[in-house]
Amino acid sequence: MKTIASIAELRAALAEHRRAGRTIGLVPTMGYLHVGHMELVRRARGENDVVVASIFVNPLQFGPNEDLAKYPRDLARDEKMLTEGGVDFLFAPGVADMYPQPMEAVVDLPKLGSELEGSVRPGHFAGVATVVTKLFNIVQPDRAYFGEKDFQQLQIIRRMVEDLAQPVTVVGVPTVREADGLACSSRNVYLTADERRAAAIVPKGLDEAERLIGSGVTDAAAVEKGVTEFLSNEPLARPEVVALRDPLTLEPVSEIGEKPVLLLLFVRFGTTKLLDNRVIAPKSARFAKVA
């Protein structure tokens, strides 16, 4: 694996492969990799001739009260993991490489980006969409890989690609989980031992929603209330968002009919906010074709 910081150098290296007709897969990350990231790499490695991973802690997606400096970083460890995963190129630019001057051009999806996490992190998804667009412009991948754990981010990127006719296929990869069901996340390292034990309640909240919907509850507010109460039984858990949404548009759902619904959870443990989600097919939808 070759580590490159320069945009020009990466473009030159990839141009040779592109001329040879090789497909390129991109795995964008902010580093401090875990097994979830490596599942993205595994998928990319199996579906492309050339795999590029990027590590860039993007200042545009951090708000004024979010500590960019404290975001965990360990480039040597990440390089070792990516090498073992079969990555061909690691693009690891500095801020001066990506943003040599203050950014005037911003990619913003104001409707999708102001919902849910965007409502409490204004500008966050504009920062994400802008840096992902810039990475797409630099790498020009055939496919790009993102985890389904950050479902809102994934849908924003999909819509951005569609609206801007960007020539890349966005591949969503199912969430990788730890032994107790907690979604793998770089944020998990911030949890204390007690908070980590308590965090096992989060995936159980998804199970509770599935149980309620499977039992015939069709009122979305009742499901959201039931899951909130379930999560609140854990003293260290502070549910911030328990929301049933349309999986494609992220618009609120009031009644659960035959279409699948998306449950999004944002639960805080101390200073750490954990995200999780599940697309749930109502019982009537699951068995509609059995006849």
UniProtKB/Swiss-Prot annotation:
Source organism per UniProt = Sinorhizobium fredii (strain NBRC 101917 / NGR234)
A GO MF annotation of the entry reads: pantoate-beta-alanine ligase activity
Tell me which UniProt keywords the record has, alphabetically.
Answer: ATP-binding, Cytoplasm, Ligase, Nucleotide-binding, Pantothenate biosynthesis
Q: Listed disulfide bonds for this chain?
A: none
Q: Which SUPFAM superfamilies match?
A: Nucleotidylyl transferase (SSF52374)
* Annotated function: Catalyzes the condensation of pantoate with beta-alanine in an ATP-dependent reaction via a pantoyl-adenylate intermediate.
Listed binding positions for ATP are 30-37, 147-150, 176, 184-187
User: What else does the entry mention about this protein?
Assistant: The reaction proceeds by a bi uni uni bi ping pong mechanism.
Instruction: Indicate the family of this protein.
Output: Belongs to the pantothenate synthetase family.
Q: Where does beta-alanine bind?
A: Q61
Q: Give the top-level enzyme category.
A: ligase
What this protein is called in its record is Pantothenate synthetase
Write out the GO biological process terms.
pantothenate biosynthetic process
Q: Which InterPro entries match?
A: Pantoate_ligase, Pantoate_ligase_C, Rossmann-like_a/b/a_fold
Describe which pathway this protein belongs to, using the record's wording. Answer: Cofactor biosynthesis; (R)-pantothenate biosynthesis; (R)-pantothenate from (R)-pantoate and beta-alanine: step 1/1
- GO CC term, one of those recorded: cytosol
